[in-house]
């Protein structure tokens, strides 16, 4: 079989300093700060490579059933942990939350849904290529030692019945911010959102830049950086924004508010 991009690696980064390795460098040797964490979308796998030995020392996927096996320090782990975490499909931006941020040491993933994986063919995929399908996304944060999920952002956690209302089937990312909120890039729809730990959207932006045919405003990934990263621009004044009443809006060109 001839195929291109059969792994689709979309993120790779050093773990950096973390409390696991600081607490016990032998027990948690998998989390050496120099080790590299990798996300492979098409194979539905995320893993950590020991930079010295070149061996995989932590690994989840491609299956996330209650009887699926995962690996810690190169040793197989059993139990129901992967089943509780839930199937991950077509993920992006697997990374460890850096030291100094809320949730430091946990793993965060933008679990796209959409399509990925390999397996038995079915009507949706006669070749068995991308045989995993799901029409919603979620951002998950979990403990890398127990795989216990500690936070999720999705349509369901926002109280929405329609999963597609939080959905980007490719690209995308998530970044923990110093204030405990999370900056999420729903890349396929060109949307950035800052959400609180309680899943409230407190800031949003939709890219106005579309491709020539006007159908795509894709944003691959976005990060929030400190003002001093761009010293040539004067630091702006920040001010609090009061959320508007949902039942009040203004008709364009009218100064009179309409209340429903």
Language model features: what each stretch is:
Residues 1-260:
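Histidine-/acidic-rich catalytic cores in large beta-rich domains
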């Amino acid at each position: 079989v001839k195929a291109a991009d059969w792994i689709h690696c979309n993120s790779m980064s050093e773990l950096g300093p973390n409390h696991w390795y600081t607490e016990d460098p032998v027990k948690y040797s998998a989390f050496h700060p120099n080790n590299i964490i990798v996300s492979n979308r098409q194979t539905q796998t995320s893993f950590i490579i020991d930079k010295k030995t070149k061996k995989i020392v932590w690994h989840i996927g491609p299956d996330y059933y209650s009887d699926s096996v995962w690996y810690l320090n190169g040793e197989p782990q059993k139990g129901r942990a992967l089943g509780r975490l839930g199937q991950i499909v077509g993920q992006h931006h697997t990374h460890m939350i850096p030291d100094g941020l809320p949730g430091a040491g946990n793993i965060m993933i933008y679990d796209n849904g959409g399509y990925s994986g390999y397996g038995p063919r079915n009507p949706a995929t006669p070749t068995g290529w991308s045989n995993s399908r799901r029409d919603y996304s979620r951002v998950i944060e979990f403990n890398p030692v127990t795989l216990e999920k500690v936070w999720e952002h999705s349509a369901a956690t926002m109280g929405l019945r329609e999963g597609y209302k939080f959905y980007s089937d490719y690209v995308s990312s998530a970044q923990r911010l110093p204030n405990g909120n999370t900056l999420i890039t729903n890349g396929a729809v060109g949307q950035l959102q800052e959400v609180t730990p309680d899943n409230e959207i407190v800031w949003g932006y939709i890219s106005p830049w579309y491709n020539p045919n006007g159908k795509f405003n894709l944003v691959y990934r976005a990060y929030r950086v400190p003002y001093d990263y761009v010293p040539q621009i004067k630091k702006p004044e920040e001010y609090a924004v009061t959320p508007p009443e949902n039942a009040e809006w203004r008709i364009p060109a009218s100064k009179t508010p309409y209340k429903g």
